Each structure stands twice: as structure tokens, then as C-alpha cells.
Amino acid sequence: YYASRGLGDVYKRQDKSSFKSDIGYLGQREQTVDINLVVNHYGKSTESEINASGALKDSSSKIFRGTIDFKTGSSDSVGNEKESVLMLGDGVINKTVPLILCAEENVVGNHGATIGELDDETLFYFESRGIGKAEAENILARAAIERLARETGDEETEKLIIKILDEDL
């Protein structure tokens, strides 16, 4: 019912500066989620951490492009990128495109992705407690987003996110 798009560029110009991003998303129905985040390391001994987690349901699609770019002069810098995707529909489309660019020596860049589905063992666990497949999928989809909402440290933001999840799931 809508497409959401997130674009972001971060510039790490100061030595020993750090950046952390925790991204949560939920794609449902025919929604398209499009996220592009670029972290540019210029300063020495800078750090970046990109964490994305979410769920795709129904016929939704998602593309996540996370780029860590070590520019000339960014020696001794570290960049990490990690994504976890829960795919909860036969028609979902997931694209995870990590990119590490390096124009400097002595830097560390890591990326990884975990892509999973509701497996039979987990479904059996839920069903043995009277919870059907659709409700189990909603519980799992909601869990990653609620965790991020709690980590904001802002009660109003947390309440807003929970309200949206209550309406959507």
C-alpha cells in the first residue's frame, strides 16, 4: 500500500569519531522498502556500525544497500555492516547489497547477512501452544521492530512504533 524509501549519507571527517545505525523495517502486502545508507570514512581511527533487521510478508519487497567507503586518509578505521531478514511469504523479494570500498591501507571492513524463514520446528512450537501460522509470523515480524523501539530510549517514539505495529499486525 505504500513504498518507503530511506536515503542517507554519513561523513566521518573527524579522527576517532564513530557512527552507529540500527534500522528496522516491516514489508507487507505489496509494499516496497528501499534503503540506501552510505558511510564515508575520511578521518583516522573512525568506526561505523550498520545493523538492519526486519521482516517481509505477503508479496512485499525490499532492497537494502549499505556502503562503507574508506577514503584516503582513513587509516586504522573499522566498519561493520550486518543485516537479518525474516522472509514470511512465498511472494517476497529480498535484495541485500553490501558494499565495502577501500582507498586506504590498514582498515577493517566486515559485512554479513542472515536470511531466514519460519521453519517447521519453530512453527510446531507455536502451534503446540495454540498459536497458528499467521499469528506466529506476526509475532516474529513484530519482535525485531519492538526490540529496536525499546532501544531508542525515547518513550514517545517507542509508543508510536508499538501503536503502528498494533495497527498493522
Regions found by a protein language model. Give the residues of each.
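A glycine- and small/hydrophobic-rich beta-loop-beta segment
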Residues: 26-27, 35-47, 52-56
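Detector for repetitive beta-architecture
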Residues: 9, 16-18, 36-38, 47-49, ...
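Extended C-terminal subregions enriched in glycine
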Residues: 58-62, 74-76
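Feature marks extracellular polysaccharide-active and adherence modules
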Residues: 22, 40-42, 71
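A mid-sequence, solvent-exposed acidic-amphipathic segment
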Residues: 72-107
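Amphipathic, heptad-repeat alpha-helical segments used for oligomerization and assembly
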Residues: 94-151
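Long, compositionally biased
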Residues: 153-169
